[in-house]
């Protein structure tokens, strides 16, 4: 009988051991800022075999992934990818937005100090993001035994993906010419970061963010984090979030078809191939799960489009603000429009209250005036967008992109390919932020651990990325998640 009991206990232990949850050793989230989905194929024949083509040829591609909110900008994209949520819930309503009648930056936090430099570039944290991230949920699932690290040149592209419970987030201080962090995470830089900065710094104020070299610097820092933090070497799954910022900055300056854009994507492909080889060696080819996506897309340059007889143009939002304020000055005796951002107009509550006016009257008068402008397809009260006659898919994106107290009171939808800016025959750049496919259609690739080669054209959304990764890890999805697991 004792032998039988011993045998049964042994079998139970063996079954229990074999039934342990299987997870990769490392999860890598890679965001390429302003990467339109079609860049996967526009440059395909020029890519090498070890970078983007390797992801396409060995991984799984969700070919029809769209952003399901507007405005489509960097901070919102990064927060939505990792929270599986939208601005209406996360509170990240733009890169910049107005709060209490003041313009604020999404990650600015005067309560923390810069670590690694004497500038204010490190006074940043995720405190304005109201939802958890993949990394936060991974930490909770492992009782905070996992390591989560964020790396990017842009602060918001490192801070928001890494989340609230990250072990570290590092970004580039242009004035110092090296990577920094904030006291939100730590009181001093780890020795490996100090050593990296000594070997990989630039001259102070050199704008590496707008060069292909910035891509290389980001991947070098990410590789250093893998090696020195020993990511993927512990008992629990670790996470590394990486964002490539120069693709966005170069795109803004030179648009989607310039030689500069070509150069940065060739550099991206080369550096990605080396990064994947490093992961193969350091973590193991089948031990890491990587996903690649983008924070948003971009419109083609309007001069380029016009050369081919395709309607396009620029909306001079500064002129609209001035014109609207002039109109409201004549009607009410005040000029309450503080400015435009994210295709929204922001009103100054203090100015309206001091004049003894009802805010709704000012909003209604503003909308009536703006509707006369043929540049706009729709002008609406953000609080009442559900009552506006417009296609449901646009309405849904407007609703998802609105956060009371941080978004503007008045929203506008311009004609397709008409983005915010000034008209100039010399203008070579581009913008993003609209609800149309050129801004919303982004890549979403899975690669590595437990991923079979394939593709899908089923409509998928940016908010589906986080629940997909969490489902693969068998952990809870982020607490504000509205997406669906797709793999």
What is each of the regions a protein language model found here?
Residues 20-60:
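Active-site-proximal N-terminal segment of extracellular/periplasmic enzymes that hydrolyze or transfer
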Residues 47, 64, 73, 96-123, ...:
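Secreted, luminal/periplasmic, and some membrane-associated catalytic domains
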Residues 62-82, 150-158, 243, 289, ...:
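Short, solvent-exposed turn/loop segments enriched in Gly/Ser/Thr/Pro and often Arg
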Residues 86, 94-236, 245-252, 371-374, ...:
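His/Asp/Glu-rich, glycine-adjacent segments
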Residues 319-357, 431-473, 487:
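Substrate-binding rim/cap in mid-to-C-terminal beta-strand-loop elements of soluble/periplasmic
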């Amino acid at each position: 009988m004792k032998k039988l009991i011993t045998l049964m206990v042994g079998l139970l232990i063996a079954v229990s051991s074999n039934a342990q949850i299987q997870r990769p050793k490392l999860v890598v989230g890679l965001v390429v800022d302003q990467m339109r989905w079609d860049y996967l194929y526009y440059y395909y024949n020029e890519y090498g075999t070890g970078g983007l083509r390797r992801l396409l040829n060995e991984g799984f591609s969700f070919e029809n992934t769209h952003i399901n909110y507007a405005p489509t900008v960097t901070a919102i994209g990064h927060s939505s990818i990792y929270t599986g949520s939208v601005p209406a819930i996360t509170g990240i309503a733009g890169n910049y937005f107005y709060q209490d009648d003041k313009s604020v930056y999404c990650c600015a936090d005067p309560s923390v100090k810069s670590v690694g430099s004497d500038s204010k570039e490190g006074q940043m944290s995720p405190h304005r993001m109201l939802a958890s991230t993949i990394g936060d949920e991974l930490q909770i699932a492992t009782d905070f035994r996992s390591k989560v690290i964020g790396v990017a040149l842009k602060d918001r592209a490192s801070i928001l993906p890494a989340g609230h419970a990250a072990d570290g987030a590092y970004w580039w201080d242009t004035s110092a010419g090296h990577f920094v962090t904030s006291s939100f995470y730590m009181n001093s830089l780890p020795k490996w970061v100090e050593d990296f900065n000594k070997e990989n710094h630039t001259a102070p104020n050199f704008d590496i963010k707008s060069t292909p070299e910035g891509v290389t610097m980001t991947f070098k820092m990410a590789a250093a984090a893998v090696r020195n933090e020993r990511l993927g070497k512990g008992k629990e799954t670790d996470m590394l979030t990486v964002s490539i910022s120069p693709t966005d900055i170069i795109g803004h300056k030179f648009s989607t078809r310039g030689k500069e854009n070509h150069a940065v994507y060739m550099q991206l492909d080369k550096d990605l191939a080396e990064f994947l080889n490093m992961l193969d060696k350091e973590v193991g080819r089948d031990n890491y799960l990587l996903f690649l996506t983008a924070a948003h897309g971009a419109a083609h340059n309007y001069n380029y489009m016009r050369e081919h007889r395709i309607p396009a143009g620029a909306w001079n939002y500064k002129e609209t603000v001035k014109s609207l304020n002039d109109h409201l000055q004549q009607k009410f005796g005040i000029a309450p429009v503080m400015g435009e951002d994210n295709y929204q107009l922001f009103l100054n509550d203090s100015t309206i209250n001091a004049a003894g006016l009802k805010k709704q009257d000012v909003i209604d008068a503003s909308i009536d005036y703006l509707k006369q402008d043929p540049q706009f397809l729709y002008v609406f009260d953000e609080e009442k967008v559900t009552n506006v006659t417009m296609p449901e898919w646009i309405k849904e994106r407007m609703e998802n992109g609105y956060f009371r107290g941080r978004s503007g009171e008045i929203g506008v939808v311009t004609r397709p390919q008409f983005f915010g800016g000034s008209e100039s025959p010399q203008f070579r750049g581009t913008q993003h932020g609209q609800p149309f496919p050129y801004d919303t259609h982004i890549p979403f690739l899975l690669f590595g651990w437990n991923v079979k080669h394939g593709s899908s054209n089923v409509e998928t959304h940016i908010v589906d990325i986080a629940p997909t990764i969490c489902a693969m890890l068998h952990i809870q999805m982020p607490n504000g998640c509205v997406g669906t697991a797709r793999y």
